[in-house]
Amino acid sequence: MMHRVGFNVIGRRSFFTVNARRQVLKSSFMGLKPLQLTALLLAGSAGYLYFMNARSAIHEYVVCPVVRLITPDPENGHKLGIWCFKWGLSPKLYFDKDPESLHVNVFGTTMTNPIGCAAGLDKDAEAIDGIMPTGFGYMEVGSVTPVAQPGNPRPRFFRLPADDAVINRYGFNSSGHDVVYNNLMKRVNKFLNSYFGDKSIDKLSLYKDKLLAVNLGKNKNGDEVKDYLKGVEKFQSLADVLVINVSSPNTPGLRDLQNEAKLTNLLSEIITKRDSQSNKPNALGKQNHKPPVLVKIAPDLTEPELQSIVEAAKKSKVDGIIVSNTTIQRPNTLKTQDETLRNQVGGLSGKPLKPFALKAMKAVSKYAKDSDLVLVGCGGISSGKDAIEFAKAGATFVQLYTSYAYVGPALIARIKDEVAEELKKEGKTWMEIIGEDNK
């Protein structure tokens, strides 16, 4: 009896509380004149549209700083960002059409623009349709390992705001092949079953002129060849591009795979595996699907070591090289004063990485000059000027991540605008400036 009375009392309180709130809201709006109500609705709609526009400065000056403020542990900020992208609480570039000067002819197709999202942002392929529409022409998910693994202990991700940089020692934390495969298959099935889907699209990004790559890693105690072969077998049917990550500084022994003999053997086995599966249809039913294979390398290599990597890429017949991953170096140009912070173990990315990545790109480009290898620039890119520097050094397209985390979605439109403006001044297209400094 007492329980019933208690329940009734609580129920009445809840009822009256809800009713009271409704009355307050009703009286508040009833007091407004039609013109005022219209103005309020228009202001709210305008605010929403402004927030949902990827060109809006609100993300750089309000949203991103607030996220950093409420998430002292950057890893939680990363998770919050992915959650927002996953559930559609993210802006998009509405009605934007990339100019032809930005188009990239690569891998037998055309990408709408040369700005790509690097691996590490969407590790488990959860948020592709939130991230891609902010303006990217290419997106890489992963790194993904065969078996789920937690990575290194936390904290393992550190912000260096004075340098627009971060240090991470994640250690290939991954939900594993099965989870990522299921996430990608759900996207494809939803697309195929959608009444409004453009069935003429033949790219696994599910966008007409954009590419989706899956970045493959190995487990901490996994086999240095078999783990990658498992990745090729699992994701060949779901990727426009496959990326072999042998350059993370946070997995013991991984960078040893950049040795010419080891790398040649690994990449040759991967190409053999890919070719043996090319007679199978991909997830969209396309026959003879043979995604290009890229290898991602470190910037912390000598010129002879970079030359050896290019030779390994040529011998194994992979399609290209991503230059580069994060650096283990700590340049004396860092503005961060906290010695403990700046000397955290892990890979440094963001603006301070650019000189190392660009130097490596120039060396790789020099030795890849007489080949068909596609070079991809990655490391410290945060402006149109940066993107053009990498292109002139030999990059067919570029990737970024850290600058996107600091500035927000508006960065992509800004970079594309800056590149298009500079190309117009020079009277050239993006394709015409690739490798210009090496000619």
Curated annotation (Swiss-Prot):
One of its GO terms (cellular component) is mitochondrial inner membrane. Catalyzes the conversion of dihydroorotate to orotate with quinone as electron acceptor. It is a single-pass membrane protein. The chain crosses the membrane at residues 37-53. InterPro entries: Aldolase_TIM, DHO_dehydrogenase, Dihydroorotate_DH_2, Dihydroorotate_DH_cat, Dihydroorotate_DH_CS. Binds 1 FMN per subunit. Pfam families: DHO_dh. Keywords: Flavoprotein, FMN, Membrane, Mitochondrion, Mitochondrion inner membrane, Oxidoreductase, Pyrimidine biosynthesis, Transit peptide, Transmembrane, Transmembrane helix. One of its GO terms (molecular function) is dihydroorotate dehydrogenase (quinone) activity. Pathway: Pyrimidine metabolism; UMP biosynthesis via de novo pathway; orotate from (S)-dihydroorotate (quinone route): step 1/1. Its main location: mitochondrion. Its cofactor is FMN. This is Dihydroorotate dehydrogenase (quinone), mitochondrial. Signal peptide: none annotated. It comes from Candida glabrata (strain ATCC 2001 / BCRC 20586 / JCM 3761 / NBRC 0622 / NRRL Y-65 / CBS 138) (Yeast). Substrate binds at residues 123, 168-172, 245-250, 325-326. The active site is at residue 248. Belongs to the dihydroorotate dehydrogenase family. Type 2 subfamily. It catalyses: (S)-dihydroorotate + a quinone = orotate + a quinol. It is found in: Mitochondrion inner membrane. Residues 1-22 form a transit peptide. Its EC number is 1.3.5.2. One of its GO terms (biological process) is 'de novo' pyrimidine nucleobase biosynthetic process. The keyword Signal does not apply. FMN binds at residues 119-123, 143, 215, 245, 296, 324, 350, 380, 401-402.
